[in-house]
Design a protein with these regions (language model features):
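Short beta-strand elements
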Residues: 118-154
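Cap/lid segment of the alpha/beta-hydrolase catalytic domain
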Residues: 232-295, 349-358
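Hydrolase active-site cap/lid region
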Residues: 261-262, 320, 324-369, 421, ...
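C-terminal catalytic histidine-bearing segment of alpha/beta-hydrolase fold enzymes
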Residues: 403-447
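The feature captures the conserved acid-bearing segment of alpha/beta-hydrolase catalytic domains
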Residues: 353-412, 418
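N-terminal cap/lid segment of alpha/beta-hydrolase-fold proteins
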Residues: 41-47, 170-216
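Gly/Ser-rich "nucleophile elbow"/oxyanion-hole loop immediately N-terminal to the catalytic nucleophile
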Residues: 214, 275-320
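Short beta-strand element of the alpha/beta-hydrolase
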Residues: 207-211, 218-229
């Protein structure tokens, strides 16, 4: 009898343990793979379609050395003037999605990999610093109908007058003899300084300046870089170049070399993660967050041009996303800039979604007429001499939509201009061996 009871107890315990194990398995983290990727392509060069022509996206799964699982494609597609459509498909055969546009614009199809329960599957890579990076398995494809014909929605009549007034505001705040310059690092080949420069607006222009050791007067080019959107403490660069002066400009005018409590309070004071999204402030071009940022950027350039080591010729600016936005501002507003390298430029064609039914950006600052004074598509018209290389425009990037970048490129007045379109790229991910289409000097070059 005792043996029978023990057998029953063990049997029940086994059933319960198995149930718990199955529950835990069902709640486990999504699969993480190292070799699996989604491949995507179009039936012709993605920027060469005509109105009404069928656009065909084809996607396949490459599992590499990983064993295929019980997976599904999840996809959504849409575009300028199109409604979003969603779907699911098996991964054991090509996924084909067809669409078309009746006028110049962009279409997209985004495909992600999911398990049978609907959870996304991720890839894992190891960075050079040995830290693991986890990313979703995704392909963000895009295609366009006559993108070279896309136009902006019209600029404010007093655009130039407004910026003349802002430059006068900046000039009314002198900075010569008032710059705070503190040595914070010394490397074998140079120095790093924390810089604070008086500026118009609520805060000074700040950033880290690097100057090589033994630099002679009028001997070096200057590189100025701008940062993407975020609220993080800026830290000194870990390395410096012996061949140039570099100024990394802070987007917010934060004090440098402060304790964590300062940065916590500072970011709260400027609006936290939504610092540029305040609708009340964005009703007026002089009260929006971008105003102080732009003035700090211009003041930063004014300062570096006073450095005795500058060769007086080469002033190169760069940045991506919000940094690309700032890069466009200073290149348009300071004729001393000789070369600019913006990437995935943020806030292009802010009015396009409302006025032209172009597919709007995810997480973009909501359009107001006041923000038109900061739109890169209008700044582009004022860039007449500097060499411009838009180093990346993602055909599937709807944080910085491709329609806006196409208009930005089309509007550039300079004869030296280039844009590189990346197939499958969204705002953060570039597929390995991505198809790149390069336009240069107004001509399309297929690669």
């Amino acid at each position: 009898m005792k043996k029978l009871l023990l057998a029953i107890v063990f049997s029940i315990a086994s059933i319960l343990l198995n149930a718990v194990e199955q529950k835990l398995l069902s709640e486990k983290e999504p699969e993480t793979l190292t070799n699996v990727r989604i491949l995507g392509k179009t039936n012709k060069s993605p920027l060469s379609y005509l109105p009404g022509e069928e656009i065909v996206f084809t996607f396949t799964l490459d599992t590499g050395k990983d064993k295929p699982g019980d997976w599904r494609f999840h996809f959504r597609h849409g575009g300028d003037g199109l409604k979003i459509q969603n779907g699911k498909a098996p991964v054991n055969k090509p996924l084909i999605v067809k669409t078309s546009l009746t006028k110049p614009g962009f279409a997209f199809c985004e495909v992600t990999l999911h398990d049978a329960s609907g959870k996304r599957i991720y890839s894992e890579t190891v960075r050079p610093n040995r830290k693991k990076l986890k990313r979703e398995i995704i392909f963000s494809a895009g295609a366009a109908v006559q993108p070279e014909k896309l136009k902006d929605c019209g600029e404010p009549a007093d655009f130039d007058t407004f910026w003349d007034q802002q430059k006068k505001r900046l000039a009314a705040v002198p900075f010569m003899g008032k710059v705070e310059k503190k040595l914070v690092r010394e490397y074998k080949n140079g120095y790093v300084y924390a810089i604070s420069i008086p500026s118009a607006g609520p805060r000074p222009a700040t950033g880290y300046l690097t100057i090589p050791k033994n630099a002679k007067a009028k001997s070096l080019p200057i590189h100025v870089s701008f940062f993407g959107y975020g609220i993080t403490k800026q830290v000194p660069p870990p390395v410096i170049s012996s061949r140039l002066i570099n100024f990394q400009v802070n987007a917010h005018g934060q004090k440098l070399e402060q304790n964590e409590e300062y940065y916590k309070d500072f970011f709260k004071s400027i609006g936290g993660k939504g610092y540029a999204y305040n609708q009340k402030h964005n009703k007026d071009p002089e009260t929006c967050f971008f105003n102080g940022m732009a003035l700090r950027n211009l003041r930063a350039l004014e300062y570096v041009k006073t450095l005795p080591e500058w060769n007086g010729k080469d002033l190169i600016v760069k940045g991506q996303s919000q940094g690309g936005l700032q890069t466009m501002w200073v290149t348009a507003l300071d004729p001393a800039v000789t070369e600019a390298h913006p990437s995935i430029i943020w806030c292009c064609d802010l009015a396009g979604s409302l006025k032209q039914k172009r597919f709007g950006a995810f997480g973009r600052v909501k359009y107001t007429p006041a923000l038109e004074y900061y739109d890169p598509v209008f700044m582009a018209k004022r860039i007449r001499k500097a060499k411009i290389v838009i180093t990346r425009a993602g055909l599937g990037d709807y944080t910085s939509p491709p329609s806006g970048l196409a208009i930005c490129y089309n509007n550039l007045a300079t004869p030296e201009k280039t844009i590189k379109w990346y197939q499958g790229s969204n705002h953060t991910i570039i597929p390995p061996e991505a198809e790149i289409i390069t336009w240069t000097a107004g001509k399309k070059v297929e690669k």
